[in-house]
């Protein structure tokens, strides 16, 4: 699968998604949009995905991506939703499969994360065959 085409298809289907990244089942960043540099944040993202998939996983109160802090408002095996309290956007992290694979998206600050949730989760499910 061409991850760049995949991400741009998501962004075309869901205009509220401003940036996105794909992390594979080994926890490696395999694609990110050009203006979103999250390689320094991948370990934290992998930890959250690992915890959310455990029966007794520990919810973190927040996460930082590109030095911006987001408060985690939903923590389920299907999704992790976080929002920046200074209105600088939202993060939807959609785990894929049973490993560390995930689709990570940055959502338009003027929209709510739920506006993009259906399309983000729908696209994340398309990654399951790969990861």
Question: What is the meaning of each model-derived region?
Answer:
Residues 1-131:
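Non-catalytic interaction/Regulatory regions outside core domains
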């Amino acid at each position: 699968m061409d991850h760049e085409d995949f991400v741009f298809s998501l962004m075309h289907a869901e205009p509220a998604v401003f940036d996105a990244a794909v992390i594979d089942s080994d926890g490696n960043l395999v694609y990110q949009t050009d203006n979103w540099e999250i390689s320094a944040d991948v370990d934290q993202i992998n930890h959250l995905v690992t915890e959310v998939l455990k029966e007794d996983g520990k919810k973190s109160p927040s996460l930082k991506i590109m030095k911006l802090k987001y408060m985690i408002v939903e923590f389920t095996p299907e999704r992790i939703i976080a929002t920046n309290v200074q209105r600088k956007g939202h993060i939807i992290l959609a785990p894929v499969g049973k490993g560390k694979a995930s689709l990570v998206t940055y959502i338009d600050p003027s929209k709510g994360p739920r506006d993009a949730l259906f399309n983000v989760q729908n696209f994340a499910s398309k990654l399951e065959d790969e990861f």
